[in-house]
Design a protein with these regions (language model features):
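N-terminal type II signal-anchor transmembrane helix
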Residues: 2-33
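C-terminus-biased signal that marks the final domain/tail of proteins
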Residues: 23-150, 244-449
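Mixed-charge, polar/low-complexity N-terminal
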Residues: 5, 100, 192-194, 198-200, ...
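A periodicity- and composition-biased signal for non-globular, repetitive helical segments
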Residues: 12-13, 176, 349
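Internal mixed beta-strand/loop scaffold within catalytic domains of large alpha/beta enzymes
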Residues: 142-239, 389-391
Length: 449
């Protein structure tokens, strides 16, 4: 009997070791081969008005390697700031760092089947160029699946603007005091076989948060906490990137958002300056609702319908999606929430008041006035008609809405500086001196959960 029990114990211990080894291998998946890349053969970098701009071109691995080469210090800073956020989670909610890493590793593996291989290869190139831990880069790519954020976005055109130009404003309101803004860059992509685009974001993250492609399509997103969520799906940053890379118009954007496996609650505003037109997409893990300008489907009493305008904060207009939400006072009406009163209604009221008189400067004022205080990490205004972007990032703990907006012209941005036509007149930068008053932050830093 003693010998039997000993064998049983050894067998059980062996099984545990096998399971542990299998678990470790599952959480640390393999990768593709390293490649020899000359980053300067296709890629390059420049500084525009104090912002690092990296130009990435070629295969996924090449573009990742180019990003890592030209923005190495900022990539390392992104990873360091991300590590700091995990340390902060331990201090604020008692979540040990190893547990936070484990949660992110599991999340990545659950999302992995839905993440295109080209993005995995790009992350590998980024890690190889910088010496960063690939596992940390992977963790950063799924942070949107387990954190919350409050943002806002609007698209206006036609009768709403002075000359029909389509303006698209986007406030990215998240964690301001983690220092992520110190790693801000503009990435200009020319991926093989896909649509070129420009993305305002952070050096160590290959996903997209804000940007516009050369087909005049601008993307934006708003966090909308829901009970209908899943860890299995395509993370937000890659949904937005696929929109820019794959979608030349709104029909394709709608097809994409309906076909991907979504994870948690997000609202999107996507515009096409060629049309001009825009759509709002309200999504949960299992639902997608699509709305256009002045949409008769917006029957909820708190909806603000305006011709030639699409805008969103957290609250959904679709009754089913709204019934699943856990934000903006859900399941009650959103009145009194900062999301509704300051962001959604704030946009709608200002567009109505200035209807037909909105130019770039006025659109920027609407953007700044509806930003959140102490959480406005970056803010972007695009002129989708003329392929222009204005981008501001937070600085020294101060909101992006209070900073200088840097202008980019996508008609010439993809050219090397020596190939660009000379500028014959000063660019119109819509940056009024007096900062607009914004709302206080709603809640504290979202924990990793």
């Amino acid at each position: 009997m003693r010998r039997f029990l000993k064998r049983l114990f050894l067998g059980f211990a062996g099984l545990l070791l096998i399971l542990a080894a299998g678990g470790w291998l599952w959480l640390h998946p393999g990768r593709g081969p390293r490649e020899d890349v000359d980053p300067a053969a296709k890629g390059w970098s420049e500084e525009v008005d104090g912002t690092l701009v990296v130009h990435l071109k070629g295969t996924p691995y090449e573009m990742g390697y180019q990003r890592g080469h030209f923005a190495r210090e900022k990539v390392l800073l992104t990873v360091a700031r991300f590590e700091g956020m995990l340390d902060r989670a331990k201090k604020e909610v008692g979540l040990p760092k190893f547990a936070a890493n484990l949660i992110l590793d599991i999340t990545y593996q659950l999302c992995s089947p839905y993440i295109p291989d080209r993005y995995k290869r790009e992350m590998e190139g980024l890690a190889d160029a910088t010496g960063c831990d690939l596992q940390m880069i992977r963790r950063g790519s799924v942070i949107s699946v387990i954190t919350e954020r409050g943002c806002s976005a609007f698209a206006i055109w036609g009768g709403a603007t002075t000359d029909g130009t389509l303006y698209h404003g986007r406030n990215f309101d998240w964690i301001l005091d983690a220092g992520l803004e110190d790693s801000a860059i503009l990435a200009v992509y020319e991926p093989e076989g896909l649509i070129p685009f420009a993305s305002a974001g952070y050096a160590g993250m290959i996903g997209v948060l804000s940007g516009m492609n050369r087909e005049h399509v601008t993307i934006s997103q708003i966090g909308a906490v829901t009970s209908d969520r899943s860890l299995r799906g395509l993370p937000l940053e890659f949904v937005l990137r696929r929109m820019l890379e794959e979608c030349p118009d709104l029909d394709e954007a709608t097809r994409l958002i309906k076909s991907v496996k979504n994870t948690v609650g997000f609202n999107y505003v996507v515009s096409d300056g060629k049309a001009p037109d825009a759509r709002a997409y309200e999504t949960t893990a299992n639902h997608v609702a699509v709305f256009g300008p002045d949409d008769p489907k917006e029957t909820v009493e708190y909806a603000i319908r305006i011709p030639d305008a699409v805008f969103r904060a957290d609250e959904a207009m679709d009754p089913t999606v709204r019934s699943l939400q856990r934000c903006a006072k859900a399941p009650d009406l959103p009145y009194g929430s900062i999301s509704y009163d300051h962001r959604y209604k704030g946009i709608g009221t200002r567009v109505k008041e200035q209807y037909g008189k909105i130019d770039a400067a006025a659109a920027l004022e609407i953007l700044k006035a509806t930003a959140m205080v102490d959480t406005n990490l970056h803010a972007v205004l695009t002129d989708g008609t003329n392929l222009k972007m204005w981008v501001a990032h937070a600085k020294n703990g101060q909101d992006a809405s209070k900073q200088h907006f840097v202008e980019y012209d996508l008609k010439t941005l993809f050219l090397r500086p020596e190939d660009r036509p000379p500028v014959t007149a000063p660019a119109q930068v819509p940056a009024p001196e007096a900062p607009a008053e914004a709302a206080p932050a709603e809640g504290h830093t979202p924990p990793v959960s």
